[in-house]
Structures are given as C-alpha cells and as structure tokens.
Design a protein with these regions (language model features):
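Divalent-metal-activated hydrolytic enzyme cores
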Residues: 1-77, 102-103, 112-121, 125-134, ...
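Non-catalytic terminal/interface segments that mediate subunit docking, oligomerization
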Residues: 39, 83-86, 96-97
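Glycine/small-residue-rich phosphate/adenosyl-binding loop
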Residues: 79-81
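Residues in well-ordered beta-strands of folded domains
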Residues: 85, 109, 239
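Short glycine-enriched loops at secondary-structure junctions
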Residues: 86-91, 111-114, 142-145
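Catalytic core of membrane glycerolipid acyltransferases/transacylases, capturing the structured
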Residues: 91-109
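Well-ordered alpha/beta subsegment
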Residues: 135-139
Length: 310
C-alpha cells in the first residue's frame, strides 16, 4: 500500500553534525522552507491525490545532536539556531511544521504565546547561554487559538471575564491579550464601518485579527528586549500558523491555497503604530464579499503593508 511519508532521517554513514544557518537570514529561510515542505505534505495527505502516493518528505537529523557516539555521562551541546515562542495548543507541532529536527529549535510554549516573566526569562537564557548558535527569535501565533478566543468572548461579553469558568490565573492570560483584541476591534470598525459588530462573521474576524496583532505585539516587545541586550545579530520575526492550510504567514489569509509564495515570516514591528496598520490590513483582507467590490477583494493581499522579508 502506497503511503505519503514525513520522515526524520539519520544516515549512519554520514554521522557528522549537520550545518547550522550562519545568520538570521539563513535561519529565516530554513524555517520557511521547512514549513513549505510540511504544508505540502499535509495537503497531499488531505487530498490523497494518487499522483502523490509514495511521496516522501524528509527532515535530515543527526544522531550526534542527541548524544549518539558519546562516552557515557557526556552530554551533547545545546545549539538551536532559533528560539520559537508559541502557543501550548497541541494542534501546533512546532518542530514538524517548521521541518526541523533535534537541537534546532529552543521552544517556549504558553497559552496565547503571551510574554510573562517566566517566558521572558527563558528567552533571556537563550539569548545569553546559547548566543553562539541562536540567530533569530520567532513569535508563532495560530488561527483557532483558544486563549485569544477566550479574550475576544470576554471583550464582547465582559461578564464572562468574571465567571467561575474563568479562574484567576487564566484571567492573567486574557488580560495580556485584551490590548490586541481592542486593536483588532478598532481595525474592523475602520474597515467595515461603525456597525462592524453587527456584520455576519464579525466575531470570527475579530479572533483571527487579534491572533495576528497579539503575535505582532509580542514580537515588538521581544525586539525591544533584543535591543536592550545589544544582541544585534539576532533578528525577531513573527507569523501565524493556519490550522486550515498548515502554512505560516503574515498577513494570514485563512482562504489562501497551499503555495510556496504563501509562506513567510514577517519582521517584528519597529513602532507601536504598526499594530493598527496590521489590524486594518487584516480587516480589509477578511471583509465579507457583500461589503466590498470584487476588484478590492482581488487586491486585498497585495495592498497590505505588513513588513515581510524579501
């Protein structure tokens, strides 16, 4: 029976350490290319196209990275090339979706990818203790985020924030996301009009936009942390993983087809004013067909101004 395989491969005849990206740009390309491979694999599995049966997608791994061939008691050196700050959601397999293997990524996962003290402390550890290898920091949001959805629902129905189903520690996460939700709501009002909240699809659009703005705000904060630490060689990027097409991108279009050009990581904002631009751009992209002419829909993605690497 033919299968469509996603394989972690080690070649014992070539057991040397694999090369790591030499700089931030190479690190970004490695992550994006890995996601293109993963998204293609997922699409092939979904469609079960007979022409793709037997296809094999390979992530090269070195056993040396996890201690093979070392004397007993010796530990392998930790040398990730990227720090990824993502959500705890089990549907977002970080190494897999970026096509990376052992010792490639230093991953910090917390609901809503919010930057609390413990999270920031972990990032500072990576920037200092692992400075020889770390080339970039990535904030990874995802569509369908439960933490952002909870924040949006509390924003729309404030009494939910104080309900027994929303315990105190969970409220601290919700509070950190409220700023992104308010920015998203302002973007929708600007794009969809003052009665945006009454337009069908408003809640889902508010969630999707808040996910993007939340990731952008975290990336902005981390850019400041990197600058304060004078780690000029480290680039801060961000993107959103779609559970629909399995692509990481920014801006993110839930309706976008699986295509190499639809994968990209954006540079962290350099100014808080960029948050409103992101929210408005996403609102334009998600505007219902009944609220815009066809020509505007066709150009929605092209007109976004979110800074992405070229």
């Amino acid at each position: 029976m033919s299968t469509i395989d996603y394989i972690y491969r080690f070649d014992p005849k070539n057991s040397s350490l694999k090369s790591s990206p030499p700089d931030a740009e190479a690190a970004r390309k490695s992550l994006e290319n890995g996601n293109r491979m993963f998204a293609k694999w997922m699409e092939n599995c979904r469609t079960s196209d007979i022409s793709t049966e037997g296809a094999c997608y390979v992530v090269e791994c070195s056993g040396v990275e996890v201690g093979m061939n070392r004397a007993q008691g010796q530990l392998p050196k930790q040398a990730p090339f990227a720090v990824v700050v993502g959500c705890s959601d089990a549907r977002v397999p970080t190494e897999l979706l970026f096509g990376q293997g052992f010792n490639d990524l230093f991953i910090i996962r917390v609901a809503g990818n919010v930057l609390g003290d413990v999270c920031l402390g972990s990032i500072e550890f990576a920037m200092n203790a692992l400075s020889e290898s770390v080339k970039c920091i990535v904030v990874l949001g995802h569509l369908g985020c439960g933490a952002v959805t909870g924040a949006v629902d509390s924003y729309l129905q404030p009494l939910k924030f104080w309900s027994k189903s929303n315990p105190p520690m969970l409220r601290t996460i919700t509070q950190r996301i409220f700023v992104a939700v308010r920015e998203a709501a302002n973007g929708l009002k600007e794009s969809w009009g003052p009665d945006a909240h009454s337009v069908p699809g408003y809640r889902q659009a508010l969630i999707d936009i808040a996910v993007c703005v939340n990731a952008a705000q975290a990336a902005f904060e981390l850019r400041l942390e990197v600058e304060r630490a004078a780690k000029w060689e480290i680039e801060v990027l961000y993107g959103v993983f779609s559970l629909l097409n399995h692509q990481v991108s920014m801006p993110v279009n839930p309706r976008a087809p699986v295509h190499p050009d639809n994968v990209n990581l954006a540079y962290a904002p350099t100014n808080p004013r960029e948050f409103s631009t992101i929210a408005s751009s996403m609102a334009d992209l998600l505007k219902p067909a009944s609220h815009e002419p066809a020509s505007s829909r066709e150009n929605a993605t092209a007109n976004t101004t979110i800074p992405s690497p070229k």
